[in-house]
Amino acid sequence: MNTLFGKAKEEARVISPKSVDEYPEAPITLGTTLVNFTGDWRTFMPVIDESKCVKCYICWKFCPEPAIYIKEDGFVAIDYDYCKGCGICANECPTKAITMVREEK
């Protein structure tokens, strides 16, 4: 169990901000995928079966990178330059239209 006791608990209360305004200002940085490709270290890649896709866009909403985009026909596609192969899209897809396959390089 990860519980704070005694003095540590008191100190945690003292240094814990009560609101967002109490946090110190920090520089804003761009995420790595906005600047660099991240798909080259992927070991598994998602593959979309459009016959199973119902265009719910849950995969697009849950993708932590800008790797999934919506095509003109309404289906989703994957930009493998940015896909890290995390599998969140496949895990969240309600119709199992996305499967993860081993990357072949």
Curated annotation (Swiss-Prot):
[4Fe-4S] cluster 1 binds at C53, C56, C59, C93. GO terms for molecular function: 3-methyl-2-oxobutanoate dehydrogenase (ferredoxin) activity; 4 iron, 4 sulfur cluster binding; metal ion binding. Its cofactor is [4Fe-4S] cluster. Binds 2 [4Fe-4S] clusters. The keyword Iron-sulfur applies. PROSITE patterns: 4FE4S_FER_1 (PS00198), 4FE4S_FER_2 (PS51379). Its EC number is 1.2.7.7. Residues 44-73, 74-103 form the 4Fe-4S ferredoxin-type domain. SUPFAM superfamilies: 4Fe-4S ferredoxins. [4Fe-4S] cluster 2 binds at C63, C83, C86, C89. It catalyses: 3-methyl-2-oxobutanoate + 2 oxidized [2Fe-2S]-[ferredoxin] + CoA = 2-methylpropanoyl-CoA + 2 reduced [2Fe-2S]-[ferredoxin] + CO2 + H(+). Keywords: 4Fe-4S, Electron transport, Iron, Iron-sulfur, Metal-binding, Oxidoreductase, Repeat, Transport. It is an enzyme of class 1 (oxidoreductase). Gene3D superfamilies: 3.30.70.20. Heterotetramer of one alpha, one beta, one delta and one gamma chain. This is Ketoisovalerate oxidoreductase subunit VorD. It comes from Pyrococcus abyssi (strain GE5 / Orsay).
